[in-house]
């Protein structure tokens, strides 16, 4: 028998072992409930009284439903005592993230997911909160007032944001984590997970959320940190903990929270001379590469230490064409980038979102990495990467000539002048500037030179003075535009809409939510319906003037419509909605929350007639 066949069996067994271990760690949230419950029974002396405190300040977050110049529906509402709890319902005084469900993943603007994302990393958004006193946490309570169940991970940081001296080391520890689970009730609840004990005091807590299973926007009211000033001593009950639980939990946390000692793994991958590679070298190179494509980045690091042949495969730049480093944000630093550098010379998709904050990545370290690895980059994700400055964007513009997609979402610390460098990226097809400080002059320059743009997000860009001028430039230069996000743009009028509608006939998605200066009486919405027949998603959220005439025009002209949000209008009747639903056979999402003519009875009747459509109607208790 050929030696290749037993070798295939061996390799298959190895692959099975890897998958089995990953499957075990994927259920760690279920396995560790008992473990963490025991840990929470820490013995404290009577003198070590528990401190209970609400969040003092919200210091960072990835998105929110509200405006940058308001308190309604913003993350800043998480600071302080509860505003709403124990009441349930949709209240402006709560913290709300920008998305829910899978609707945004089904839109034309949705990006393809990265390969090799660890199965235990499913966070979509986050918020970081500080507290007055550093304590050893004994409990973290989250007051959820509407559609609970989004929080999937709670972390603590060793750094004290209020200390005048920067710490020598910054550590993040997972206090609790779980896979997304569906909570059937929409009522308020006090979420009290059993948290793990950590060996440092903290006053910086991070919540990570996944809203994919939610029926509507989750609303958070407050976060309560319980803790003690002195380090507690575990009781003897902890001897009941299963050692297998500890091993699996440690493995999962390294994969889920960061590439723990990634540089050590790479540096130790220099192997001595072994007797041979068994029969591995009898297999086709491409077959081994294909199998290794299923491993996560930490798995590759471990496998590289087994033999020289597999080390060669694990370090092959072809394994790093798509590189997602976001799951390892808590550990990724300059040293990690340095060791990855030689392996990433062919990288095309790179995700550094959430990474590098609090000094983990320096401007020099990022620049060195891109100078070696930027030439083939096509897609670069940098959402919430607060280490970025003007020099970084200049390096991107110089080192990434083939870049087609750039995401700077919530990089709100970037200075306005930094955005001028984006205009040099003439091949851009996707640009996300949500919650940035881009100014009008820089944006006009970008639009002038980046005429290949197909997807553009300008949501909550508060530094832009005149959105009509921007809309006019978009209509004149961006003829290939397919999706446009103008969420909460403060001053676009019917003139800007006219320029958009005439200049961008390929538009499939348009978000005009919370744009108060648009009035239906000017005919702007009927113009959109006439000139943009390819529309699949249209958000007119909180526009009080949307009326039956607008809905009728959409029904007649935009039959491909899949998502429509008309929250807050007083002038749309059930009859016009029925006509819309009869004409738009692909409609799957219709938000009629706070539409005064659409009561619960009307929603029930429409649901009965069109059961495939998710009709959303929020409420306030």
From Swiss-Prot:
Protein keywords: Cytoplasm, Disease variant, Leucine-rich repeat, Membrane, Methylation, Mitochondrion, Mitochondrion outer membrane, Nucleus, Primary mitochondrial disease, Repeat, Ubl conjugation pathway
F-box domain ranges (all copies): 277-332
Ranges for the LRR repeats: 376-397, 402-421, 427-448, 452-474, 480-501, 504-524, 532-558, 559-583, 584-609
Asymmetric dimethylarginine modification, residue list: 28
Annotated compartments: Cytoplasm; Nucleus; Mitochondrion outer membrane
Tissue note: Expressed in heart, kidney, liver, lung, pancreas, and placenta, but not in skeletal muscle.
Domain of life: Eukaryota
Illness association: Mitochondrial DNA depletion syndrome 13: An autosomal recessive disorder characterized by early infantile onset of encephalopathy, hypotonia, lactic acidosis, and severe global developmental delay. Cells derived from patient tissues show defects in mitochondrial oxidative phosphorylation and decreased mtDNA content.
Protein name: F-box/LRR-repeat protein 4
Organism: Homo sapiens (Human)
Lineage: Eukaryota, Metazoa, Chordata, Craniata, Vertebrata
